[in-house]
Amino acid sequence: MENLSSACTHFCFDLFKKINENNSTGNLFFSPISLSTALAMVFLGTKGKTAEQMSKTLHFDAVKDLHSNFQTLNAEINKKDVSTYALNLANRLFGEKTFNFLPNFLSSVKKQYSADLGTVDFISALEDARKEINKWVSEQTKGKIPEVLSTGTVDRSTKLVLVNAIYFKGDWAKKFNAEHTTDMPFQLNKKEQKTVKMMYQKEKLPFNYIPDINCRILELPYVDYELSMIIILPDNINDDTTGLQQLEKELSLEKIHEWTENMMPTDVHIHLPKFKLEDSYKLKSQLAGMGMVDLFNSGSADLSGMSGSNNLFLSEVIHKSFVEVNEEGTEAAAASAGIAMMCMMREEEFNADHPFLFLIRHNATKSILFFGRYSSP
């Protein structure tokens, strides 16, 4: 399963860099695990060149027993006996009721991804179909994503809508005291600032300083330490935008492992803004630009493992996400453990009053559930 987590992390940073081409300074938030899972369900039904392109783009070529690994990963993430946090990754296919999907494909998707096929009438009851899909996503994300499909995103030629939703709500292992939250300035760049509600606590937490890129890394565990938020904060804004440019160029699976492996429990003065991010992406152009060209092309998509007809292709990949960070913890949605005993003696400052990157990690599987950039209130 480690290979699968690595593949999903590689894809996470590839996609981040692609999205960054058209949005290099704004807030950003998405769920790589949710997207990888959704696209793996499609991959199950692809053949030929379409499958090759997907495998390469998603780094699936390095993973043995891909779909059974996803089955194990999803079971680990969706553990039902957890009472300290809510985490739910859900998948579903919605198919045009007159269209024939191969029974083999449907049974594989059900077995490996716990996803069934909802049949809807795109041809004569388009609006009802759209509402039904939105209702399912809203239920899976506890109402945080009420409308994954806006008007006009599906039409009467739609045959298949692939929906994937992930929801997370967790409390910090060490909560912030709301009485210590105050209005403070947040520096957007060298010239502009805005006021934020800044939380504060002093706590012993895993911390690391990376001198090569002048960055501080802090781990904020959630209750039970099964999940953590990891925040990567440059010392200063040293470029003409967010101060994150050098760090973002360096991002890779290897670097994240290197930076987070040597974290030491350290007394840290933490200033972290309360924030809420909501994002919506249409990812067809980014994924095609990363190499998945044929999947979205009606003339060349090979989804013959999904349907006997040769005119099926994917028209769009829509991803919506939501995260809220406050004194109690984090609530996040997207449609789509122990601490070492060595200890640093000195106290460190971790003052997130300027743009930073953050990720929410499932510690046992080292899977990045969510990845984001906070650059503006």
Curated annotation (Swiss-Prot):
The modification N-acetylmethionine is found at M1. GO terms for cellular component: cytoplasm; extracellular space. Gene3D superfamilies: Alpha-1-antitrypsin, domain 1 (2.30.39.10), Antithrombin, subunit I, domain 2 (3.30.497.10), Serpins superfamily (2.10.310.10). CDD domains: serpinB1_LEI. It is found in: Cytoplasm. It comes from the Eukaryota. The record marks M344, M345 as: Reactive bond. Keywords: Acetylation, Cytoplasm, Protease inhibitor, Serine protease inhibitor. SUPFAM superfamilies: Serpins. This is Leukocyte elastase inhibitor.
